[in-house]
Amino acid sequence: MNISANCLFSGSSLASEVHAAAVNGDKSTLLKLIAGNSELKDKEDQFGRTPLMYCVLADRVDCAEALLKAGADVNRADRSRRTALHLAAQKGNYRFMKLLLARRGNWMQKDLEGMTPLHLTTRHKSPKCLALLLKHMAPGEVDTQDRNKQTALHWSAYYNNPEHVKLLIKHDSNIGIPDIEGKIPLHWAANNKDPSAIHTVKCILEAAPTESLLNWQDYEGRTPLHFAVADGNVAVVDVLTSYEGCNVTSYDNLFRTPLHWAALLGHAQIVHLLLERNKFGTIPSDSQGATPLHYAAQSNFAETVEVFLKHPSVKDDSDLEGRTSFMWAAGKGSDNVIRTMLDLKLDIDINMTDKYAGTALHAAALSGHVSTVKLLLERNAQVDALDVMKHTPLFRACEMGHKEVIQTLIKGGARVDLVDQDGHSPLHWAALGGNADVCQILIENKINPNVQDYAGRTPLQCAAYGGYINCMVVLLENNADPNIQDKEGRTALHWLCNNGYLDAIKLLLGFDAFPNHMENSEERYTPLDYALLGEHHEVIQFMLEHGALSIAAIQDIAAFKIQAVYKGYKVRKAFQERKNLLMKHEQLRKDAAAKKREEESKRKEASLQKGMQNMEQNKFQVQLSTAVREKTASTLQLSNKQTDLQNKRPLSVSASQIQLGRNSRGSPKACRSKGSPKESCLSSELQSEGHNIRQELLRKHIKSKPSCVHFHCGKVKEVTKVEAKHQVAAATELNGEKHKEHAVEANGTSAHGNRRHASACGTAGAGEKTRDQSLSSSGNRGHCEGTSVVVCNVSCAGGIARNSKRCEAVPKSKRHQQKSRHKEVNYERCSPAGSSRPGSAKVVFVNTRNATVCAIEHANNVGNHELAKKTSPLLSTETESTGTGPRNPAACSALDDSLNLEKTGEVGSRSAGDQLCSVAWQSTNIELIPLEIRMQIIEKERTRKELFRKKNYAATVIQRTWRSYRLRQELSQLLSAKRQRKEDEDKWRQETAAFLIQVAWKKQLNHSPQKSVPSCKSLKSVNKTSSAIKTSKQSILKQIYGRSQEGRVYQPARPPSKLKLSDVQLVSANNLQYVNLLENVGKSKQFSYNMRPSTAAKSKSTRLEH
């Protein structure tokens, strides 16, 4: 002690020398120092201690007495508020305590912890110091409490000093004072593992053996029995439970009884003791519904469990979650308890489920106890049992990452392809826990790495959510797809950018993850948007370097493309609406024309019937006059005529045969009969009989309305009707004049004219045949697609004058003039306005005759034919065999003409008196059409051409716009290729140069608008053989609306390109903006939907500049 003191205080100040002298017991030096300076007797060191305190600590009684004689302060306190008496009581130094108490030391002084010297004296086994203090203390001062509200009796019980307890109780210390935790001295006495604590407990209980003292609960509800059981002190438990007032099943604040504590700590003897002394006979449960057996089972105390199971009052009840003690044992891996319970309780159900349908195997797998799992599988536990979440034990093991348990379960037959109620597979749970080894095991057992749950999330997305990069590496190496989107449109990259896992983002982009997937929400966020919202600056920079786009940038790009597509859509829609409107108008016009034709036909039919009645009256008058002339003739002439009639019958037969043969050869252009007239050769009886037959046939003919008009295809147009009307009018006037001349010549003709009848008719037939052929060829050259009307015409005059060659043979010059007129009409004729196909005009050739005269001649010929059939059976037989009978050509032609004109509405109504003349056939000139009607036709044609020109122009603009859009798309692909292939700059330059050369070679920079040349000017010199129009390449719209009316749109020849290959500069992407890639620069804007009006000036074509 002296050596240490010398070392401590060597080289120190004078005060330190005083303290050193006190410690060393150097009384002479101490007195010398005090004599030199009286203040040194109470000098404090760095701890606030005086030389007197050091004398107590060093047990230097002589020095202490010297200091006290020198006037040292006995109650001086140090920094911890302790005096020399505190130090003497703490050391249990009886002499110093007696010395200090004699010098009036304060025994009630409290230190910083509120302890008095009385509290400190309880630490020692000897009660002498305690007894010395109790002699100086008043009766009420013995229960002084420290800062923890503990008295000297608390400390005596804590230190297990039964003598101190007895001494304090003798001095009236209160045994029921609780401390700051609510504990009384009996709690501290019972909370001791030493068996000798039984004496302290007995001392306290002997002082007051009350029930309230035995069952006193601290602030946590624990009784002295709880503490005794917790320390495993069987003797103290035995003492406490020996009192009848002790409650063995008292609850603490956790609803645990002393029996729960004994089971939890595995005190089998205490358990047995408590079970035996339980007066209620029931096993209480804690706040979770667990019995003491649950506690013993989870702690793997097989002996304690055996004690419980063997006691008759114990049952394996379930807790509040429906778990039995067997499940608790499985969850804690208590294999010994499980074996004990399976051996002792044969009726135990190993697959019993709890409230959530979990089994003991679920609990063991969740906790990762491999041995327990093996034990349960050996005892036939169900390996794929499902709980309410549809989780098997494998799910629980994958969630917690217990690799060995997973392997054990898979070997035991667990299925890896099951999913829970959310669609999560075991791989999902392994990825959520970041267990890379478990993921590898599951993938090796053939689980799909891209399996999706009901929300569309993959295991890769689950791993990305937690940023488990090791787990992501395993999944990606096993072909996990990083671009799969869940139902909300999010990918694994969305989760990584949201949480700012830069290393995982680098890994994912290295496996070709697309950086611009948009979610399906209203905001349509991309991974870059999530990084921006989270303010992860490093992630933002990295994503931008790898081509990531925000939703705002994507919307700008999409808006540009949508606008381009929408413009095209508007053009197509407007075009379709215009087309539908035109078609609707065309249909309405056709319906109106058809209705008008129907009304005209009905009106003309009524007028025809009225005309036929007038014609029949005139016919009777003519027959009456003829009968009077025949009666005045002599009987000799009658016999001669009969003889001549018999001689001419073979000629009639032959003529009919010739006519039939001509018809069979396929040229039925006119219905002819070469037989001579029958009126002058018959008797009065035959004439009367023929008159009756003709009357009947005429009525039938009027009812049946036969027609020789042949319809090929289509319908007759309104313009054709107008031409036909004027042709009929002109032809009627000319025929009227010629009819008078033929009538004069016919009256002067004798029997010699009758002998020339055959030759004249043959000549006329040949002339008409030639004329019909020319008309048919001229019709073919016109390319008429509508209705071609061929009218049976006869050039012979009516009555006996039909034999004249002048009436039948038409001069060649006149026929040539007629052909030229037809050609002129055909070529100058345009399709009607509103027609859907150009060149669809219908050409109609009309030949008219006097309807009244033709009808009379037809009735006479029919009657004569009936008489001929009776007189000549051979003729009738041959005629019936061929299916056609010889008819009077003039009558047939005139009647057919009149019926055709009435049916088609092409001949105007005329009075019966104006149509009594029959003349040779003549074509109608277009000059005969009134000027007003011609102007209407021309105006309609102009309107139709203008409409077609607009359609053609719209189609051209749409095609040009589409081609320019394709060029812009190729250019954008080249620009994006540059950003993606920075390392291959030369290859990109080559592709760019090739693209520019292609544009300069194939596309024309200086465009002029296409103008169609009118066909009316270009077709004046077209001949018959070259009238067919060659079809050109048409656009889709031209194919829909047909070719142009002229048949061909003449396009100006494309000038040779002014650009040369040497002029093309291999420029970078920044110079591409100076290249004019659009065909229709400045022209597409002239359309109705574009930016400027069509009257704006045309933009000049741009050239490539170096």
UniProtKB/Swiss-Prot annotation:
The keyword Nuclease does not apply. InterPro entries: Ankyrin-SOCS_Box, Ankyrin_rpt, Ankyrin_rpt-contain_sf, IQ_motif_EF-hand-BS. GO terms for biological process: kidney development; protein localization to ciliary inversin compartment; Wnt signaling pathway. Residues 636-645, 653-666 have a biased composition (Polar residues). Required for normal renal development and establishment of left-right axis. Probably acts as a molecular switch between different Wnt signaling pathways. Inhibits the canonical Wnt pathway by targeting cytoplasmic disheveled for degradation by the ubiquitin-proteasome. This suggests that it is required in renal development to oppose the repression of terminal differentiation of tubular epithelial cells by Wnt signaling. Binds calmodulin via its IQ domains. Interacts with APC2. The D-box (destruction box) mediate the interaction with APC proteins, and may act as a recognition signal for degradation via the ubiquitin-proteasome pathway. This is Inversin. It comes from Gallus gallus (Chicken).
